[in-house]
Amino acid sequence: MSIVIDASVALKWVLDEPETEAALALRNEQLIAPELWLAEAANALWRHVKLGEITAEQALARVSELVNAPVASLPIEPHVLRALNLATEIGHPVYDCVYLALALYHDTHVITDDRRFAAAAAQPELAGRVRLLGS
């Protein structure tokens, strides 16, 4: 069975953060993500550069690692309408709901380190579809 991961999980593969070990353990699973995951991860690394936490060269090297990560990047287009519907239902941004729409399509779940996303999706009809990393 595939598992959907979001950028917050993938970033832990290249940054030393809490739950890094749990994120690394997921690399043994069959992982999928909407193609936007890589842009989101690169944007987060850019923010780390802007804050002076890593260099631009380090960010580029880490994005290269993510490009080669064991994640099947899937097209967003087939899931955008469902993501918009989910976003309006749970009151959470569409870009996160694309991960949820992909998980629903593949009858699986999303693993995230985004507590707000997990809390927004904690509704009876979505039970267990968005899980916090390490829980």
List the predicted regions and their residue ranges:
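Structural signal for conserved beta-strand scaffold positions within catalytic alpha/beta enzyme cores
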Residues: 33, 75, 131-134
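Active-site neighborhoods of divalent-metal-dependent phosphate/nucleic-acid chemistry enzymes
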Residues: 70-116
